[in-house]
């Protein structure tokens, strides 16, 4: 009886190095990509991409016609991120950079590269800081990356004031902002949070060319106006007349809490203090303290 064969393994490093030398190398390349807004030309090898990634297998399944084939245009992925994806497909490793890792993560999700996605997520979690966290939160919400969203929200809860001052906060979508405004653990006072929400809505209104109140509508119900002192609420009401942001009925509800000297236990959240809520004299009348 013939003895079963034995699988032996050579050194992996030289193999990986050799394949890395083919990344974006026109030598023996049979497919060209034009990627990103910069329209950078990138060379690759059809069989390798197809066997490593179902997305590229489908994309490249048609046989190229005679003559010089037209390039495959991928305009939404930046060139640097696409090259990192290619490096991973060729070598099963990639060099990630803080400034571009979210773009690589986005590409990994869109191309169905689960292993690269997990590597990017691990990198992002370790690299989280005030400047990166809102961009990471936006990616997490957009692609339903629940664990990353939880880590981002927890980071922002611990560094609320610094995060609210970043450009990334102003560029959040409404669905990404909602979990922050719903949090009891934000280390920021409600008056400052109202100002941040107004700044966010102004930026969105300018970009989308829509009224501030319309942009703010999906999120402002999460502002806890009953936590503001009467003088603060009066000032907010006056500003709201000049620049509508908050529905009038929401301000009326806050005044009702002051008039009745109690919170609305049925609705709960509008009267519940956050971790960073500064004490005010009327808070002793509210039913729901910070938990």
Curated annotation (Swiss-Prot):
Disulfide bonds: none annotated. It comes from the Eukaryota. It comes from Bos taurus. Residues 29-98 form the BTB domain. This is BTB/POZ domain-containing protein 19. Pfam families: BACK, BTB. SMART domains: BACK (SM00875), BTB (SM00225). InterPro entries: BACK, BTB/POZ_dom, BTBD19, SKP1/BTB/POZ_sf. Gene3D superfamilies: 1.25.40.420, Potassium Channel Kv1.1, Chain A (3.30.710.10). Residues 134-234 form the BACK domain.
């Amino acid at each position: 009886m013939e003895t079963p064969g034995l699988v032996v393994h050579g050194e992996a490093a030289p193999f990986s190095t050799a394949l890395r030398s083919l990344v974006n190398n026109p030598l023996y390349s049979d497919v060209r990509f034009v990627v990103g807004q910069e329209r950078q030309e990138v060379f690759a090898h059809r069989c390798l991409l197809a066997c490593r990634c179902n997305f590229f297998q489908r994309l490249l399944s048609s046989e190229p016609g005679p003559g010089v084939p037209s390039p495959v245009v991928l305009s939404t992925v930046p060139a640097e991120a696409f090259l990192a994806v290619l490096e991973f497909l060729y070598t099963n490793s990639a060099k990630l950079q803080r400034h571009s890792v979210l773009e690589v993560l986005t590409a990994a999700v869109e191309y169905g590269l689960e292993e690269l996605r997990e590597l990017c997520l691990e990198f992002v979690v370790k690299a989280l800081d005030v400047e990166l966290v809102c961009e990471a939160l936006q990616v997490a919400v957009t692609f339903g990356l629940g664990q990353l969203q939880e880590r981002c929200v927890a980071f922002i809860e611990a560094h609320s004031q610094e995060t609210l001052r970043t450009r990334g906060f102003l560029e959040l979508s409404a669905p990404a902002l909602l979990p922050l405004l719903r949090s009891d653990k934000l280390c920021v006072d409600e008056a400052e949070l109202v100002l941040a929400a107004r700044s966010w809505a102004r930026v969105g209104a300018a970009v989308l060319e829509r009224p501030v109140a319309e942009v703010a509508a999906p999120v402002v119900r999460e502002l806890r106006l009953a936590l503001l002192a009467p003088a603060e609420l009066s000032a907010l009401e006056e500003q709201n007349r000049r620049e509508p942001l908050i529905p009038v009925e929401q301000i009326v509800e806050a005044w009702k809490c002051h008039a009745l000297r109690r919170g609305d236990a049925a609705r709960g959240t509008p009267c519940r203090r956050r971790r960073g809520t500064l004490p005010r004299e009327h808070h002793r009348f509210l039913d729901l303290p910070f938990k």
